[in-house]
């Protein structure tokens, strides 16, 4: 999609492709490289999940790592709540469907510093 829209953007690439997961980011990087687009020199690419192996890509992928243990606990609490089995203290109905999971930005070499306009 990025490559298809270059023509409508005066031949310019966007500054960054922010992908919803690392697998998608890997595909974007591969497609860009196959078309002679350099990552991160021509465009930055980020992923999400920090799956195994992304630190070994070329270039190593900048991504977001979330705490899957916390995410699993939250999912189980929500499932128990929805089944009516939640006697979890401190888990009121007002928290139903809402939760925050800690996340860390893992900066690697697929992103460059944005130039000033």
Report residues per predicted region.
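Flexible loop/turn connectors
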Residues: 4-117
């Amino acid at each position: 999609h990025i490559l298809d829209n270059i023509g409508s953007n005066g031949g310019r690439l966007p500054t960054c492709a922010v992908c919803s997961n690392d697998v998608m980011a890997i595909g974007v990087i591969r497609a860009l490289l196959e078309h002679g687009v350099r990552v991160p020199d021509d465009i930055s690419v980020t992923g999400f999940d920090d799956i195994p192996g992304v630190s070994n890509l070329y270039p190593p992928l900048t991504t977001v790592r979330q705490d899957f243990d916390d995410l699993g606990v939250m999912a189980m609490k929500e499932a128990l709540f929805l089944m009516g089995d939640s006697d979890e203290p401190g888990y009121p109905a007002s928290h139903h469907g809402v939760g925050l999971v800690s996340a860390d930005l893992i900066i690697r070499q697929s992103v460059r510093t944005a130039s000033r306009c």
